[in-house]
């Protein structure tokens, strides 16, 4: 038998036990469970324990059945004899054995250290051999065999002790190290992780729990089973069980759910919900800043000051940049009298302005009275001595008022062209801007420039932008108005400067501005009458080729209520229509088209309207026309159409035969009846269930007209001749509403009775509208009335429509 074989057979490596890790934790590291270098000193302590316990190996006797005759350990030439006596069987004395025990040391469990033990035993035998020079080589070999057999049996008995179960053995250590290395190298290999956990569970179940809960490795069902087994072995499962004393709920279902996810390879979710397990507590930190009220107030004050300073700096820098930019354009930074800045007024002088851009009184038509007064002002400027020799003074201000489009600005342009003096003009909205004080400064600049060129005229268009009644919340506008009041009639007299202004809303102007001394003359520019409309049409048609059928007087009579702007638009639309059609001259048909477009709106020929809707619209408009033809005081019909125009599906237009300055009660009641004609016709022909929303605008107009008659004109017997304010008492408002409803119901009944009497004419006119779509007044009369009766009815209607209420 070889030496290595003998060593392998004698060296016992018992399995590790769990208690060894509990008793001697210093021998193992927490991560890899490898043996520490401190184990060597522990081995020395074990050796001293064995020595103190007087451990001695049992005597070894060699018998024939123990040693073969052909053994390598028995020399062939020796005179060894096998005997049965006790003395002959005793190979080593007690003294020699004690000396060998004293020199014996345990160094380790590795094979290299066992070789060291052989060397120590050999040294002991050599010392014994020196003492007994007579012993032979054969006895030394037998002594070694007996010694190793005794050591083997002693180690087997010692290893059975629990407190020595920590003995490190290289084979199991290397196996664990190999499994740990492979598992760490492949964290997503569930098979390797399961094998490692199973091996650790045999020796260190606490390590299984720790490794599993680190969540750094993928596990399968085997790993989960090993984890549960470790929890049971270490009694860590009690952390997830309910506790009736403390009221702790059971977290075992959450644990099992988590293990189910872990078995599927999910490592992202938390192991257990925070706050359920003691290992995963829910940490709550209470923050209670100990800041006094004074400190908090100081902090808020400092932050507010810093924010205010920052905003102020940004505002100042922005204003400076804007001022610099405007100054570079000739604005605020470079203002001054005579400069090209926005403060400098615009001057219009006939000597420096081309003649084509200047209007004269020859271009002003339809307002002879206003033009006459302005001609007197121009004459005063041209020849002041003619008026001053009798003590007359130049008027300081002239205010032009009137409806939009009547020619107020045109009159100012005519004065600029007629007068031989400088003409300064500004719009009311040009005074004010984003900076406070700009308006007042521009007013001063305007009058300073005018003083240097007196006598002159200053014209302010739309003066209500700055001259309206002063209000508390419009401080910047008040400053501009105050400066204007001072310049017009203040402490310093401005001789030779006439201020002209135009506005559509004279009622909202400040009384201080409209008083004598500032605006001495108030000139109203009304809408033109028939003669004025004829003059305006001749002016705009001048220079345009016209056909022989154009009757300017007829157009003027057929456009009551048109102002100068409307007539200019009419001629322009007709000219465009003629150009589109390729006509060489303007015809009456084109002028009539322009008139209808202004009065009735643009035709919508492409709009799809169903036959039922057309039929309903035809009867609706026929009801209006029948009532207008058979009601005293109603305006003559201009046209009736079911062609969609603007937002309406059809309409009946009426134009007064003469210019109206006031309206009688009969005419107002006739308007109410005409408004009700469409709704009553729908009800009579189609029934109450088929009336439509087409009459909503008619009812709205009728209600407003009845309200106006009762509350403003005093045309109600129950209310009396009283003008009701905007906010009457509740009792008065109830009485007004009752009278309005009464007027509307009476009109409804009158129209219903009238249409029942003329139902045949209603059907005839509706069928004609369905066939022709548009009918003029002559067409309607020719269809419904005989020729003589139609002429007689027209004369009677015009007589009844004359003015009866001044």
UniProtKB/Swiss-Prot annotation:
Main localisation: mitochondrion
Residue numbers spanned by region Disordered: 106-130
UniProt topology in membrane: Single-pass membrane protein
Residue numbers annotated as active site: 621
Localization annotation: Mitochondrion inner membrane; Plastid, Chloroplast thylakoid membrane
Superkingdom classification of source: Eukaryota
Record EC number: 3.4.24.-
Binding site for Zn(2+): 620, 624, 698
Keywords: ATP-binding, Chloroplast, Hydrolase, Membrane, Metal-binding, Metalloprotease, Mitochondrion, Mitochondrion inner membrane, Nucleotide-binding, Plastid, Protease, Thylakoid, Transit peptide, Transmembrane, Transmembrane helix, Zinc
Further information: In contrast to fungi and metazoa, plant mitochondria have more than one i-AAA-like complexes.
Name this protein carries in UniProt: ATP-dependent zinc metalloprotease FTSH 11, chloroplastic/mitochondrial
Lineage, broadest ranks: Eukaryota, Viridiplantae, Streptophyta, Embryophyta, Tracheophyta
Gene (UniProt): FTSH11
